Amino acid sequence: MGGNQALTSGQERGDVRRGHLERGDPHSEWLARLHQVFGGAIDIEWAIARAGAAPGQTDALGVPPGTRVVLQVRPALFPVRRNETLSLANHKEILGDPPSRWMVGMASAVAFDVMLYFATIEPVVATWKEPYAVELAERAWLNVSAFYRLMDHWGLPRTMITEGLGGETGANPRDARFIAKRFIRFLPRLLRMQWASLWRVSGIARQLKDFDRRLEAAAGLPDLWRASVEILAESIPSALALGGMLSTANRVRRVLRVRSGGTIVTHDMMAEYAALAELPDAQSRLAGLDAWLEKYGHRGPLETDPSQPRFAELRPALESALRRRASPDNALASARHSRLRAALLRPLFLPDEWRERFKDDLLRRWQRLRAKILAQAKIAVTEGWLEAPEDVFLLAGDDLSAAPATWRSRVSDRRSRLEAARSLDLPCTASREEIEAIMRQAQASPATEPDRQELSPRLLRGIGLGRRVVTGTAVRATTLLSLLARDDLPEQPILVVPTLDPGWSVVFPRFAAIVVELGGELSHASILIRETGQTAVVNARGACQAVAEGALLQVDPVRGEVRLL
């Protein structure tokens, strides 16, 4: 560049500008082919021949205009740092924002082990050295770049990732398409992937028994930390296997225009709680609550994070809600099919049933894990190592392996970091460098409220669930407990929330429709909503900013639209 020998020889680094290469980008495909020739970590100096010449004309070297010319290729002299596309969509939905330090530490600890599941099917994945999750701003961000890379490699649509996990791929129409040549080439590998997924699913019962043994053997807090990491490292690949099967089944269902037909455990949980609320007297409702908690007490809001309380611990809130209420506001029912049609459709919904059952079984172990962690934390409080048992969830592996006398100071430091991270105005999906820039800006300037003065849109688009158009009044909420304590709902209430997980199902019957800012078509909550036949629009970006409490809304799931009237 301008005869700068140090720069062109690779001894110095110039102005580095990173960009996001979209699917179908010609430079990306050309560089990928070049890398196949040389391999390894390399610096490539290249240029594009002078443009603007007449057709057929060449430059002094005989190169046609627009041709890419390789000037030199050399081993990289600087560390190659990935600028991954990261997303909070799925983790924000199931873990909250921000999650506990314990949960973030677990996700970071298993980040590379999880991707080995794909490497057993596609060996090239091991050479990518891509983590499943990246820790930034006290959160575990899903590394969607790794999954997009895998989809591109196999010729599959990138939208298969966002369907199951939420988030967004952008406006590139190529993201929703197959890459025909690659798909045909790797079709045997994809069939092998489905077989491997079935094999892993068939071993889930053995896996759960192994989890039981590990939990039983774990004693102190460091042991419980290791057990939780080991269980998570095994359970995420199983969940991914089920998710892959579910995504395939969902595409078949779209072709057949079949919307519902499964029997999932969270639907039973919701229906049985709704039946309690319909009982005529409070005493009967409270008596039935014991039986309900026996079956579903291991569930709860943000239940994937062990730091979050289960329904068994939230009995006072559930009891108070049942004392005040005699019946739900909006009766829900699953879609009805003839026996023959239901039997024919059920195989298409088995992945839904298996995934929800696996999560339910896993959460029973998570409840036991939480109880054992808190029991050991109480001992730590007695010893003076912690101020309160719940403080243990502000610690992770490195903290727990340190001297217990340091735990209090570590908790204090982590709490300060969490409070600072909580105030960050973070995008749902962004590049690593964009997120780091937001963090640096927050450190350099005092915390301020994000600017929300721009005009709110009157029309929001997302993923529609259900068929019935509903007009009603917006009811905003950020926590399940705030809804359980609330009686003053309008006649046609429409729940508007930033995220949703199956724990919220106990209040679903109280609402005529649901609007969720984040979420995918195949998320746990979306599957439940679909099976109830309830009207909803998920992944309605900007809903919590645009929709005020009491606003008049129309939710149209067929169009996937939310209109402010």
What does each model-found stretch correspond to?
Residues 7, 23-42, 49-80, 474-493, ...:
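Acidic, glycine-rich flexible loop/linker segments
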